[in-house]
């Protein structure tokens, strides 16, 4: 499965980068995340439970950050196991300065196997896209509110995906 997208986040690139490397922000942003533990600056373990088709899948796995080019890009690789199957994948995450903040783009390659793979690629693709949208909405909301708290800036924030406003407070 391949998935890609881009998001506009109305914060400067350095703040977005720092948040992408903050384990607590990631834990709160990942759909269904029950735990997210930092093992080193580039290694984490995580457990997340999500409904995928008829399965309530709880995955536990390892995550590594590679090819780090701060504050511009990295590759995040992970693999996890569940009683209903396994998943593995990697995502190239890239940050670029944009007119109103930062453009975050990603390209994901993922594989699933076991019982969960039997539900079909279309349902898996739809679920993955939905989870990516939920992640980036939560991520944007969290880092925007952190920015407001720290810098006492105007609380108007927005995140756009391909020019479609997803959140506008």
For the regions a protein language model found, what residue spans apply to each?
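Hydrophobic ligand-binding cavity/cleft-lining segments
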Residues: 1-47, 157-169
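Hydrophobic/aromatic beta-strand elements that line small-molecule binding cavities or substrate pockets
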Residues: 5, 34, 61-67, 89-97
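A conserved amphipathic terminal alpha-helix motif
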Residues: 115-154
């Amino acid at each position: 499965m391949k998935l890609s997208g881009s998001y506009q986040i109305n914060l400067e690139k350095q703040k977005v980068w720092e948040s992408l490397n903050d384990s607590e922000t990631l834990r709160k942003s990942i759909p269904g995340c029950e735990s997210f533990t930092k093992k080193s600056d580039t290694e984490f373990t995580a457990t997340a439970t999500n409904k995928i088709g008829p399965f309530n899948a709880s995955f536990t796995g390892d995550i590594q950050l590679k090819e780090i080019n701060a504050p511009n890009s990295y590759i995040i690789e992970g693999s996890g196991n569940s009683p209903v199957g396994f998943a593995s994948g990697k995502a190239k995450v890239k940050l670029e300065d944009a007119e109103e903040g930062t453009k975050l783009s990603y390209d994901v390659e993922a594989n699933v196997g076991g019982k969960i793979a039997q539900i079909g690629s279309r349902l898996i693709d739809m679920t993955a896209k939905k989870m990516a949208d939920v992640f980036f909405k939560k991520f944007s909301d969290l880092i925007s509110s952190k920015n407001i708290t720290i810098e006492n800036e105007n609380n108007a924030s927005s995140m756009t995906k391909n020019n479609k406003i997803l959140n506008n407070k």
